[in-house]
Amino acid sequence: MASFLSFLLGEKKQTASVAKERLQIILAHERTGRSHKPDYLPALQRDLIAVIAKYIHINPNDIKLHLERQDNLDVLEVKIELPDAK
């Protein structure tokens, strides 16, 4: 009977550790799976164009947003090509 209980208890620990490993794999995959653009980037680009257009005439295609992951950080790079001063 004791071996049967230890077998059952041992299975629970093993099952728990397997579930924990699977959860860690899923979380790691979700953290690194941010290769696609977030939903807010197009709206952010439109807002930037609207704000900059209040002050200078700018072509909307001259604003570029790029999101990349560096180590554990998401880095948003904004490039704005300003017109030459006249």
From Swiss-Prot:
- Cite the InterPro entries for this sequence: MinE (IPR005527), MinE_sf (IPR036707)
Q: Which Gene3D superfamilies match?
A: Cell division topological specificity factor MinE
Q: Sorted alphabetically, which keywords does the UniProt record give?
A: Cell cycle, Cell division
Which GO BP terms sit in this record? cell division; regulation of division septum assembly
Tell me which family the UniProt entry assigns to this protein: Belongs to the MinE family.
Q: Which NCBIfam families match?
A: minE (TIGR01215), PRK00296.1 (NF001422), PRK13989.1 (NF010595)
Q: What does this chain do? A: Prevents the cell division inhibition by proteins MinC and MinD at internal division sites while permitting inhibition at polar sites. This ensures cell division at the proper site by restricting the formation of a division septum at the midpoint of the long axis of the cell.
* Name of the protein in its database record: Cell division topological specificity factor
Whichever gene encodes this chain, its name is minE
